[in-house]
Amino acid sequence: MLNRGYLLKGETVEGAIERICSAAAQRLYKPELKEAFKEMVERGWMSLSSPVWANMGTERGLPISCFNVHVPDDIEGITHKLGEVIMQTKLGGGTSAYFGAMRERGSAVTDNGKSSGAVSFMRLFDTVMDTISQGGVRRGAFAAYLDIDHPDIEEFLSIKDIGHPIQNLFYGVCVPDYWMQDMIDGDINKRKIWAKVLESRQQKGLPYIFFTDNVNRNKPQVYKDMNLTINASNLCSEIMLPSTEDESFICCLSSMNLELYDEWKDTNAVKLAIFFLDAVLQEFIAKTEGNHYLKSANSFAKRHRALGLGVLGWHSYLQKNMIPFEGMQAKQLTTSIFSDIQEKASKASKDLAWIYGEPELLKGYGRRNTTLLAIAPTTSSSAILGQTSPGIEPFSSNYFKAGLSKGNFIRKNKYLRELLIQKGMDNEDTWRSIMLQHGSVQHLKQLTAEEKEVFKTFKEISQLEIIQQASIRQKYVDQSQSLNLNIPAELPVKDVNKLLIEAWKLGIKTLYYQRSQSVSKEMVTSLVTCKSCEG
């Protein structure tokens, strides 16, 4: 898996781990940490993000892949931000931008002309993605964010429609509380727009939804004190940081492997991970120093030092312990695990501040980093770690071809396989029947009801339950989580509407893609109910 684009020419996996961990230890002036970092990676406790694998400790590319720019309402500023995005993309970043500050189509501009509006400028960014390939590792990707009360919103929601000039961009809508409330209370115009959002998510999986007030109500204290607004997120909707015209947020990501939580929960693994990410940030700062187009990102990195340690392997951890994804036990574990990670990460940032000092923005706060946790999607990382489940998401199947950006791989759920071996059912016929049922085991008569619960797939799990679990987790995560929903096309739109309103009410900050895998009719109703509410 790693040979496909993440390693240097002729490099072995061991060589890459050596390169990365010694670079991290050097950045911290703590050569003694190299072995501890190596152990974390070799044991699979910490999963590195793709740009860290590809670029950390090398002369090429950047070890950070996540950027956002704030597009201002004047041509000079727009040109500069476009240049910034070109540079970020060329160096391997996934980029995003907030366009909400731009005036609407048709409004007056200084030379007596009329503005062509926010969406027309997005076409420039769309073209960049087509033109600039990222040193061969992966194609550029860009997400545009716009407020739902922006006058150009309807034009924006038709991006990616057949015949629309913009086809490469991903996009998200920023929705404030007042707007949601008006829409719920019956404002006709807002209902029309909301219906478009629901329809678009059902058909295209997009737009992402960014609940502006949920985000800003729960941002770190320093951002409240400095009056910094978080306007939009990144390409994967888990980053919650403020970009301005002068500063472009970047986020420094890697993840802890929850599948092995019981191995590392009583060690200093989380502390080491936070130290490691701070080192990655330091390398980013050094590599971008003096680069004209990365000045805003460099300034943000220095002043905020924002980190985003995430997790993967949550569903794997549950299955390993024969715990269903739905129900009280998984919710209680969510609380205990994430409060534990939060506490350790926070202490690590204090330790870093004590050793290396506080950055400019955090003088007097006793911390080295404005944020510490963010839960990214991790599809490739999960495969690198030997098929652990992605992020906080359930497995979408128990048996499938995994088509990742670096190729196709066949996989069987290893914990299910162990169970089938115990039952003398690990044979071609059983797996074939699972494949024909699209990766489900609900038809296997030899499994108990409890076992079937444990091996439910993403599309068979209540989406309300996924939202409730995410809202518990969100209390401990200072940024956000890449939260996908899997909603079958046949679910009535009023039920989908209820789910999204519930997500907003429960304080969810962002919703990522909406997938729609079909399930049987009986299944559909259970997708919007709550297991643990039934007692």
Enumerate the language-model features and the residues they cover:
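Conserved, charged catalytic cores of large soluble enzymes
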Residues: M1-K34, G57, D111-L124, Q134-L228, ...
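Structural signal for hydrophobic packing residues in well-ordered secondary-structure cores
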Residues: Y6, I20-L28, K38-W45, G83-K90, ...
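Internal maturation/activation junctions in enzymes
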Residues: L272-N298, K302, A306, N321-T378, ...
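Function-dense linear segments that define catalytic or interfacial modules
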Residues: L8, C21-Y29, E39-T110, A118, ...
